[in-house]
């Protein structure tokens, strides 16, 4: 369990963030919630959610669940300077695991044109992943709640998204299954994975009607990661009001309108 010197700043940071999120939601969203009872009130849990909006997804879930959430975040969107420094400090205080998305070099090659830039980034990404895995396992074994977005990229993002349609969900990354398996490898920890669906409807220039739906925990065997990730993907898409297969679903919002 984290010591008081470590836990208190993280708790204070979370309370401040929740207050900011409530203000953002009041300005930008009408939120409805179903199934929040599926999230255990205590003990380790991973909430695996659809990623639609870069900001409001986390705010909707974080203000709904009456628990201190830790969020697995990607930091590669902040390439350096002040933004990266602020992000690094904030995630350390909040005890949020941080990764660098390995496919960033493919999606945004213009950022890696300098000689050796790709190799350096790949080394940094591997190091960040190992550190995030250690931190995640420690959090889960310590009884904490973790929010992850297995797609890796939101649909609405001011920096970059590889998505081209409103109803598109990217293939879920299997890392979430691996992290759960690592946490459970001690033979004592059991980590339920709660799927969370998000459905957005635009009701103004920058205002949304958001339906957040939690489902029953998905059984993660850890023995067949492909089957585990397929089951989780299908459940999150279903809760989001999309088809069972990626690429199906009713897209009511054009990405060109973002």
Feature locations, PLM:
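Catalytic core of membrane glycerolipid acyltransferases/transacylases, capturing the structured
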Residues: 43-121
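Non-catalytic C-terminal accessory region of glycerolipid acyltransferases
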Residues: 114-258
């Amino acid at each position: 369990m984290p010591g008081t010197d470590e836990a208190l700043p993280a708790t204070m940071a979370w309370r401040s963030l929740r207050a900011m999120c409530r203000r953002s939601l009041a300005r930008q969203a009408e939120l409805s919630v179903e199934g929040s009872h599926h999230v255990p009130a205590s003990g380790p849990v991973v909430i695996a959610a659809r990623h639609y909006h870069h900001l409001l997804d986390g705010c909707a879930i974080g203000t709904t669940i009456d628990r201190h959430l830790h969020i697995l975040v990607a930091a590669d969107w902040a390439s350096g300077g002040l933004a990266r420094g602020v992000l690094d400090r904030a995630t350390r205080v909040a005890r949020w695991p941080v990764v660098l998305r390995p496919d960033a070099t493919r999606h945004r090659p213009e950022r890696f044109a300098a000689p050796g830039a790709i190799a350096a980034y790949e080394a940094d990404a591997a190091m960040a992943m190992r550190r995030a895995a250690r931190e995640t396992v420690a959090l889960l074994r310590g009884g904490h709640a973790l929010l992850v977005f297995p797609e890796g990229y939101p649909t609405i993002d001011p920096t970059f998204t590889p998505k081209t349609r409103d109803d598109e969900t990217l293939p879920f990354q299997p890392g979430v299954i691996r992290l759960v398996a690592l946490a459970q490898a001690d033979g004592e920890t059991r980590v339920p994975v709660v799927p969370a669906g998000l459905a957005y409807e635009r009701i103004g220039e920058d205002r949304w009607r958001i339906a957040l739906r939690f489902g029953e925990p998905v059984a993660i065997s850890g023995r067949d990661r492909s089957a585990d990730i397929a089951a989780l993907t299908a459940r999150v898409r279903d809760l989001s009001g999309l088809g069972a297969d990626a690429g199906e679903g009713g897209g009511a919002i054009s990405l060109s309108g973002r």
